[in-house]
Amino acid sequence: EQNALSPVVQRRVATVVLAQRIRAYAAMAQAHSRCLVRQGTLSASEAVQALNITLRDLGIDPVVLKNPLVEAVSPRFQGLLGANCGLDPKHEQEAQALLRNEL
């Protein structure tokens, strides 16, 4: 039970979980941006600029996109997107597994 953990350990666990979620968001957002480029909705430079702005607006440094885990998982997320560049519901479990096991 987390309540039994010391405050130091609780903070460390929270930090690890937050970092994982930030990487997950960045990887999925990057996959979405690349999908929009592939569809011709955005140019590559527009997609990069929009993604960087979105991340900064959330207080996330875009350098997270260079994280090896994000770089590895983002293309795999892209394969789970549907025609509208959103997560295809039939791939939701696979996406959750990527989040849990890869990031």
What do these predicted regions represent?
Residues 1-12, 94-103:
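Charged, low-complexity, intrinsically disordered terminal regions
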Residues 44-103:
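Compact alpha-helical subdomains of small soluble proteins
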Residues 3-63:
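Short N-proximal segments of mature Sec-exported proteins
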